Amino acid sequence: MKAVTESLYSLLSRLPPEIRDKGIVLRARNRLRHWEILRRTSPLTPNPAYHNAIKDRDFKVIIVSPIYKSFPVLAVSLIEQTYDNWELLFVHDGPSGEIGDIAKSLIESDKRIRFIETEQRANDWGHTPRQRGFQEVESKIEGDFLVVSNSDNYHVPGYVEKMLEAFDDSTDAVYCDMSHDYYSWRNFHTRLEYSFVDCGCVMARRDIALAAGWNDNSYEGDWKYVSDLVDQCGTKRFKKLNATLFVHS
């Protein structure tokens, strides 16, 4: 038997496009979709330690991402999150004059998205912009948890909320499974080893992430960050969430 949320969503989706994709009906469909996502994923963490804080949106999640002349898929995925207390910091790799009008319009449409740029293009897999992002977070952006991603990555709508639900007082970082373009978009079961996890899979407490820092500008910089997180808190304070909540592209 279908849940009420699923049935109502299906009913509204049968309306003509000029009705279902506008105004109050569109907002209702989005809300129902979010509720259905949370219903279907509730078994992942049946009794979240921070249930009340998550329900009240007390935690702020910061996402740091490089960007270079690309459409910000990441921003679209965050705007669609079931959890709305987040701030996205885009750091453009060099002057941003060539970023497209559509991308610029999307970035400017949401006050939770902050945009800065480096003085010169580094062209080092986005690591210099990430380092600048860490400096910006440390000096100017308050929050509780931090995620490092990339502008063309996609976080499924329940990513932020489900990752937060996995935390408790004995957990400093949570990581999830992913779908990866390098592996034909199949489900990729992550583990804390080189080539088996991407930084976009990981959410860490802000203080732990800043203490680890972004220290490597080589191709292996993503893994070095995860490795430095492990050095900061130890594997026992990492928790694995067995769900594919992140799409690397």
Residue ranges: model-predicted function:
Residues 191-249:
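Conserved nucleotide-sugar donor-binding catalytic segment
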Residues 78, 92-95, 151:
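Conserved short acidic donor-positioning loop in nucleotide-sugar-dependent glycosyltransferases
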Residues 76-85:
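Short, acidic, metal-binding catalytic loop of nucleotide-sugar glycosyltransferases
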Residues 9-77:
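N-proximal low-complexity "stem/linker" segments adjacent to membrane-targeting elements
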Residues 142-154:
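Short beta-strand-to-loop acidic/aromatic patch adjacent to the donor-nucleotide binding site
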Residues 92-102, 120:
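A conserved acidic beta->alpha catalytic loop
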